Regions:
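Short amphipathic alpha-helical segments and helix-helix/interface helices
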Residues: 4, 86-90, 116-121
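Conserved active-site loop/cleft motifs that coordinate metal ions or position small ligands
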Residues: 16, 102, 130-134
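Short, glycine-/small-residue-rich phosphate/pyrophosphate-handling segment
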Residues: 1-29, 184-185
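ATP/nucleoside-binding phosphotransfer catalytic cores, i.e., glycine-rich phosphate-binding loops
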Residues: 114-192
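Residue-level signal for alpha-helix termini/capping positions
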Residues: 8, 93-94, 124-125
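Short, hinge-like loop/turn segments at secondary-structure boundaries
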Residues: 1, 32-33, 147-151
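Accessory alpha-helical/coil subdomains and C-terminal extensions
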Residues: 15, 21-113
C-alpha cells in the first residue's frame, strides 16, 4: 500500500496520499472530481517554504478512539439572506460539532449581525470552536477589511492554514491535544 509505505519513508508530518502521489497536506488542493490525478500540492519530497504548522503531536493509542469521536463541520457560506444564515446556524446549535468551519467569501468576508454573533457564542458555550476561513483556494484571510472587529468580539478562530486539508488536520490535532474550546483558541496560533 502506497500510503503505508510513505509512513516509513517520510518524516513525521501531515501528508495527503492519493493515486501514488504524496503531497504536504498544508498545500493539498483537490483540482478534479474524477481524474486519478485529482490533487495538486507541494510534493512531499520537496521542502515546505511556508511553514504554518504547530509543533508535532505524536498520536498515541488512546488518541485513535478519541479521533473516532471527532466531529468537524465545514459550512460554505452562500449569498443567502442573513436570516437564513442565522436559521442554519440555529439548526447546527441543536447538535453542535467540535469544530465549525465557516467558509467566508473572498478574504473571509461574512455578513453578520448581533443574532449571528449570538449563535456563534452559543456554539462556543456548547463546546464548539468556530473557525473562519475563505472559500478561495489561494491567498487566505485578509484582516484589512471589516471582518477583524466582529471576529475579535465573537472570539472566532481565524484560519492560518494553506488549504482545507491543512485546516482539518490542524483542527483534529487541537482536538486530540487539548480538551476545551478555550484551549483550542489559546493554542491555535502556536507556531514553531
Amino acid at each position: 500500500n502506497f500510503a503505508l509505505d510513505c509512513v516509513m519513508k517520510y518524516p513525521v508530518g501531515v501528508y495527503l496520499a492519493f493515486h501514488h502521489h504524496l503531497v504536504h497536506a498544508q498545500s493539498a488542493l483537490k483540482i478534479h472530481s474524477t481524474e486519478l490525478d485529482a490533487f495538486s500540492g507541494i510534493n512531499a519530497a520537496d521542502p515546505m517554504t511556508h511553514m504554518t504548522h504547530s509543533p508535532c503531536y505524536i498520536v498515541h493509542e488512546d488518541d485513535i478512539s478519541k479521533a473516532a469521536r471527532f466531529n468537524c463541520l465545514s459550512l460554505m457560506m452562500q449569498p443567502l439572506d442573513l436570516l437564513q444564515q442565522i436559521a442554519n446556524l440555529q439548526t447546527i446549535c441543536q447538535s453542535p460539532p467540535n469544530f465549525l468551519i465557516l467558509q467566508g467569501f473572498g478574504t473571509g468576508n461574512l455578513a453578520v449581525n448581533d443574532q449571528l454573533t449570538a449563535c456563534i457564542e452559543k456554539l462556543q458555550h456548547a463546546g464548539c470552536a468556530v473557525i473562519l476561513t475563505t472559500q478561495v483556494p489561494f491567498g487566505g484571510i485578509d484582516q484589512r477589511y471589516a471582518i477583524s472587529q466582529w471576529t475579535q468580539q465573537a472570539n472566532i478562530i481565524l484560519s492560518d492554514c494553506l488549504g482545507h486539508a491543512d485546516l482539518y488536520a490542524k483542527a483534529l490535532k487541537m482536538y486530540l491535544q487539548y480538551d476545551t474550546v478555550d484551549q483550542w483558541q489559546a493554542h491555535w496560533h502556536d507556531h514553531v
